[in-house]
Amino acid sequence: MKKIAVLTSGGDAPGMNAAVRAVVRSGIYNEMKVMGVKQGYNGLINAQIEEMNLSSVADIIHRGGTILRTARSEEFMTEEGQRKALNVIKVLGIEGIVAIGGDGSIRGAKTLNELGIPTIGVPGTIDNDLAYTDYTIGFDTSVNTVVDAISKIRDTSTSHGRANIIEVMGRHCGDIALMAGLAGGAESIIVPEVGVDVDEVCNKLLKGRYRGKLHSIIILAEGAGSAIEMSKEIEEKTGIETRATILGHLQRGGSPTASDRILASKLGARAVELLLQDIGNRVVGVHGKNVIDMDIDEALSMKSNFDIETYELTKILSI
């Protein structure tokens, strides 16, 4: 291959820029032309595509968000949208594509492969909800953002003797809540994989108060309930003043951690290596310390295994 393209799609994640940088620099190193697609799959449909060079990706490894911008494309899910995208790809002579994003983006990459365009999927989502890889780009940064928020909220919670419920992202996957709760020393962690027992949470809060605890931190994944509604219920049942904090899109922003920059750089470079060999229909990821790649269909068919051992550990450490 001599001409490839890179896009970022779906929700943004810290480290996407580092992945784009790795794709562009690895491609140019191997004498490829690298095109940047703006606004995700919409950019393929609307021909929002421009050639990138070394200057295009200078000073971006430390930046959050994505310089290519991103979007969720309903049109690309239609046959007409796919026809338009395929026409643009052929007119521009693009031979392969690197798609960076979450589950929907990986499914978009699968569609491109089915249309005859070799495409590699790179996992970029703070939710860490792609089963085939241990970690996704952006997850580590998001966890660190939440841990920082926990520390700040604990300060004011202690001063006022309150309980605080901190709602974090994770509709179907509780990894952010789990790991941030462990690292932040939360008293209770509520995730969609396990569900919620409000009475159990209340009993733990009351036991802590009996021992003289001045604060209580509860981490709630958004898919397991509403922090606002739960705070009202807990306050009614315990008599402890309970406040809710919804971190929202704060978790998607900020400079990526060293771990996310390293992961993104390795995965972006591996994606280019595969395209150099005219290999498509693959995703890249990480198992332990090893960068891996596998068939997209196999990757998408895998079911996430919740880390129940770590969850049980948090219950032991939060007594």
From Swiss-Prot:
Looking up InterPro entries in the UniProt record yields: ATP_PFK, ATP_PFK_prok-type, PFKA_ATP_prok, Phosphofructokinase_CS, Phosphofructokinase_dom, PKF_sf
Keywords from UniProt, A to Z, are:
Allosteric enzyme, ATP-binding, Cytoplasm, Glycolysis, Kinase, Magnesium, Metal-binding, Nucleotide-binding, Transferase
Q: Which residues form the active site?
A: D127
Regulation of activity: Allosterically activated by ADP and other diphosphonucleosides, and allosterically inhibited by phosphoenolpyruvate.
What cofactors are annotated for this protein?
Mg(2+)
In this chain, ADP is annotated as bound at R21, A22, V23, V24, R25, R154, G185, A186, E187, R211, K213, L214, H215
How is this protein named in the record? ATP-dependent 6-phosphofructokinase
